[in-house]
Amino acid sequence: MKENYNYPLDLSWSTTEMTEVLSFFNQVEKFYESKVEKELFLESYAAFKKVVPSKMQEKQLGRDFEQSSGYSLYRALKEVEASGKRFVSADKA
């Protein structure tokens, strides 16, 4: 994890939309740093997708976020979706 990184945001988004996107980024961070509740993570992703419906824009934001933070949105989402557990984390230990 990198310290003091910036979130990739679109300045044309409303405050509410920015909040939804930041909430999802925070869920991704939590996935890597501790653990997330699967249901809350997926709800946050659904809200994120309402703001960012385009796959292309989602991939670009994901790349920008990973470059900045070291955390992969794609990997986090896939692992959470595939998990049968209520709580999921990147740490397999």
Curated annotation (Swiss-Prot):
Transmembrane segments: none annotated. Disulfide bonds: none annotated. InterPro entries: BH2638-like_sf, UPF0223. It holds the Pfam family UPF0223. Belongs to the UPF0223 family. NCBIfam families: PRK04387.1. This is UPF0223 protein llmg_0515. It comes from Lactococcus lactis subsp. cremoris (strain MG1363).
